[in-house]
Structure formats: structure tokens, C-alpha cells
Design a protein with these regions (language model features):
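Short, low-complexity interaction segments enriched in Ser/Thr/Pro/Gly
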Residues: 6, 34, 84-86
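Short amphipathic alpha-helical heptad-repeat segments
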Residues: 7-18, 36-53
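Charged, low-complexity interaction regions
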Residues: 25-36, 58-68, 93
Length: 93
């Protein structure tokens, strides 16, 4: 059986690390448009995965605090992806 709580904990730790690293990457004046596009794509994939994880946790009847943690993770990745999209937009102007 899949250990959804373990997956959530691992993904949350990764999300926290990304929350620290992504702003630094985007602030780097040497980052290329291709790198930002790749980062955006990866963050979008993580946001999609976090959404699927949340849906699985809901489906299997996990408690509200667990679902809430998954929602926060999903929001974190969506926010990071939005930051990358804004950087990409600024680079194209």
C-alpha cells in the first residue's frame, strides 16, 4: 500500500527547499531564458503532482490537517511557478 503521509512529508521538505532556492535562482542576473523556462516547467509539474497527492489523500480519507498540508504544498508550487512565469515575462520585454 502507498504511504501517502511519507510522500507528503518528503514533498513538503522538497517544497521548503525549493521555496528557498527558486527566488535565489530567479534573482541571479546570469540566469537564461531557457533556464527559467525549464524551471517553470518543473515547478508546474510539481504543482500538478501536489494536486494529485492532495486528491489521493482526500480519496483515502485522511484527516483535515493532512489535507490542509497538501493544499499548502500545492499552493507553494503554484506560487513558485507564478514567480518563474513573471521572471520569464520580464525577460521577454
Amino acid at each position: 500500500m502507498t504511504d501517502w503521509i511519507r510522500i507528503l512529508k518528503e514533498q513538503t521538505a522538497t517544497g521548503e527547499e525549493m521555496g528557498r532556492d527558486v527566488p535565489k535562482m530567479l534573482a541571479n542576473p546570469d540566469i537564461s531564458e531557457a533556464q527559467v523556462k525549464t524551471l517553470f516547467s518543473a515547478l508546474e509539474q510539481q504543482a500538478d503532482f501536489a494536486e494529485k497527492l492532495r486528491l489521493a489523500l482526500e480519496k483515502f480519507g485522511h484527516d483535515f490537517p493532512v489535507i490542509k498540508a497538501a493544499e499548502r504544498l500545492e499552493e507553494r508550487y503554484a506560487d513558485l511557478a507564478a514567480s518563474a512565469a513573471e521572471k520569464l515575462k520580464a525577460m521577454r520585454q
